[in-house]
Structures are given as C-alpha cells and as structure tokens.
C-alpha cells in the first residue's frame, strides 16, 4: 500500500486460520480488535462491527468476538498455540494492514490446529504439483468457497 489512508471504513472479509483447537472450520470471527505480530493493535469500528454481528444473528449464524491476528506468514505448529495463549482466536494476512479511517472484519476459519495447511499453499501452482498436497487441494476446493460464502453473506446482510 502507498501509505495513504482510505477515506471511510474498510471491511476486511475472507478466510482465516484458526488458532484455538475449539474453533472448527466454518467458525465466523467478528473481532473488536486486530493486531499484527509486532504488536501494532487496531480497534475495529464499533458501528460496523455491530452491523456485522447483527447481520450474522439475523442470518442465524453463530459468531465469536475474539481478537484477530494479522501475520506475514502462515502460522502453524506450536506458533498457533502460542498466539492462542495470548488471546487470539484466528489469524489472517490482511486486516491489520488496512489503512482506513476505520476497519471492521468478518473472517471465517478455514484451517485449524487439527487440519493445518501446508506452507506450500503460499504458492498454489507449486503446491498443486506435489502429490502430498492433493488431499488438501480437494478439501480446499470444497471448504474454502463454503467459508468465503459465509463471510460474503454476512457482509451482504450488513449493507
């Protein structure tokens, strides 16, 4: 990003990695706060966060209000538990980096401590060429669109 801020509230939506073992794939996270791995914290816009939560409830979706971590890299293995112990429920790679007057987020857990993604998926064309990733590829093809659709439905209902 060029360092300039967006003029309004930006809504970050999409997939997240679950950090806590009690959060299955499909868990909706609508956080009050987001932080980066270096400790930079961002409080989410209260009005839009409330709108997203109300929308989730109207749709009959359960959600959690827990801190979201933004990381430069996939968080796997023992690092998941370490960040969970610090109070974070899920991790993405975008939200805390958004520069806007305000942000709000709706993220849906895809990978979990019980079902970690291979770091190969940071380069999907490379990951798909490795037979060890084919099982994950099929799982991702099924679950990623389903989870992304949940986030999209919440945003659509909040607008």
Say what each PLM segment does.
Residues 1-159:
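Glycine-rich phosphate- or other oxyanion-binding loops that anchor nucleotides, phosphorylated ligands
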């Amino acid at each position: 990003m060029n360092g300039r801020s967006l003029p309004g509230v930006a809504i970050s939506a999409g997939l997240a990695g679950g950090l806590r073992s009690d959060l299955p794939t499909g868990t909706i996270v609508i956080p009050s706060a987001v932080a980066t791995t270096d400790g930079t914290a961002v409080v989410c816009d209260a009005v839009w966060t409330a709108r997203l939560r109300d929308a989730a409830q109207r749709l009959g979706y359960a959600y959690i209000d827990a801190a979201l971590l933004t990381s430069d890299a996939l968080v796997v293995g023992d690092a998941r538990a370490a960040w969970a112990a610090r109070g974070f429920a899920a991790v993405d790679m975008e939200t805390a980096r958004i520069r806007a007057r305000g942000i709000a987020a709706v993220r849906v857990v895809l990978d979990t401590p019980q079902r970690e993604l291979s770091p190969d998926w940071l380069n999907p064309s490379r990951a798909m060429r490795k037979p060890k990733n084919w099982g994950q590829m099929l799982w991702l093809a099924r679950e990623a669109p389903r989870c992304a659709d949940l986030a999209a439905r919440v945003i659509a209902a909040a607008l």
